[in-house]
Amino acid sequence: MRIGFIGFGEVSSTLSQFFKDKVEVQTCVKGRSEKTKKIAKKLGVKIYKDYKDLVKNSDIVISAVTPFSALDVAKKYGKYVKGIYVDVNNVSPLTKHKILKYIDEEKFVDCAIIGRIKRKFKMICSGKNANKLKILEKFGVPIEVIGSKVGEASTLKMLRSLYTKSLAAILLEVFSVANKLGLIDELLEILEETEGKKFVDLCKSRVVGSFIHSRRRYEEICEIEKFILSHNLKPIMIKCTKNMFKHIEEC
């Protein structure tokens, strides 16, 4: 079996370690950073010179790029898919359905990663042939098929992300004010008393992660906004969240 990754960031490099020495893991690092190239080389991943050949020679293609790039990647390389194309990007069901214009529905799996990829996570999947992805379980990758329609997995992911990203934005503002007042330690102490230590650890993790991945978070929030609008609902909280992450990105 040959598993090809389009994009080789945190998600792909972590997943690739489940398959190491068991299947042929491959990617293309054309246009990628030196850091990404070094990681791919260190992990012993087979490197293709271009994405077209990578896709043509993969039994399972996993697209793990940025939300704003997901559709463009499918447009360029979807026609070369011979096996299964798995989109794990945090994009709205609308974007996943747009991808179907470029990839046969029989070959497409809508997939979302729930949890932290470097800790405890699972991949929820939907699509006509989502069950074919269950083969990855024998390598230790937790797969849960939740439906046969494209959009079901990404809908759940959008709802979860609406909660987590909005919570992160609130925490960023709370910690910003506390820092300005010199009351970070006191705030953490009170939060630990009322919410528990696990919540405090979660707060710290979300705040740090928001700065590290601010650009990607912003793109994900734009997808959440589209998701809300598609259901004829007014995005209120998510607009504030979007402004917060735009502010971080511009700092």
From Swiss-Prot:
Designated name of the protein: Uncharacterized 28.5 kDa protein in 7S RNA 5'region
Signal sequence coordinates: none
InterPro entries, per database record: 6-PGluconate_DH-like_C_sf (IPR008927), 6PGD_dom2 (IPR013328), NAD(P)-bd_dom_sf (IPR036291), P5C_Rdtase_cat_N (IPR028939), Pgluconate_DH_NAD-bd_C (IPR015814)
Highest taxon listed in the record's lineage: Archaea
